[in-house]
Amino acid sequence: MEADLKRKIKRLIEDRGGFWSAVKGGEYSKPGDPDIIACYRGYFIAIEGKSADGSPSEEQEDCREWVVDAGGIHIYAYNLDVVRSTLDLIDACEDGGGDDGSGRRSPLRHHEGP
């Protein structure tokens, strides 16, 4: 299930003109690294694919905190709709729907599934 979800996430990002890279374990990775790193309309997004009954590890929670503190978006993707809604929020911000009156785009931070 998790592999199928990750494949669908990658396809969704590609279909909407974004970039993604899959993080593979190995010598240069560390515990907690997200499954997918993406860039969509200039936003850095770290995505951790999760099964419906999965829960994040302590290392994954640390990674989430680091990404958010650095100004990126972190998603625990329990389903494709979580990723789709995050991309929709980015589109709304970039297309003028997220203007907070300051002239800056509204910040998006952590978006998490159910």
Positions of predicted regions on the chain:
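Catalytic phosphate/metal-binding cores of nucleic-acid and nucleotide-processing enzymes, i.e., regions
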Residues: M1-P114
